[in-house]
Amino acid sequence: MALEVKLKNLVVETLNTENVSKTIFGDGSQNTSLDSQQSQFIISNGYFSTAGDAQNAIFLLRGHSTDASETELFLDGTNARFVLEDNTSYFFNCQFIGRAQDGDTVVMHVNGGAKRGSSANTVSLLGTPHVHIIQDEIGVGDVKFSVSASNGSLKFHAVGKAATNIRWLGKVDLSQLKY
């Protein structure tokens, strides 16, 4: 039996420049606020009142730690955060992997939620994110989340280990609903 996939009203846009690439499917491609975010894959299947008010975004975060402090992971690896849109609620489902220079690895899965009201200073986490550690050969065992009221962004932090070089990669699957 063959699997057949049909895509109705498919819109594909690709922008390739340094540290920026996105492919957008569906009506989310008409949402101009997406242009400010980097490295996203957006999926939508219609909308309630405006393009992009009900959609899913998938993006990658990365960073590098050298000690036991919290290291923020960014869209571009250095300083680009995922800024939440006004009057929108979010559910995030994240996969994180860390690999130390000696080959030891940590793998984690995290679920949580956030929302933003009418301005950047109204952003908040919804409850406490649930962290599931699948394997931790490094001995770090944690990722943390916070929000920035200065720009209304969701912040992702990996907790490193003293005197250990670790590269971090996070894949975030983010459902967003605006009203």
Cite the ranges covered by each PLM segment:
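Surface-exposed ligand/attachment interfaces on beta-rich extracellular proteins
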Residues: 32-33, 49-90, 97-107, 119-126, ...
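Extended low-complexity, serine/threonine- and proline-enriched intrinsically disordered segments
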Residues: 109-114, 170-172
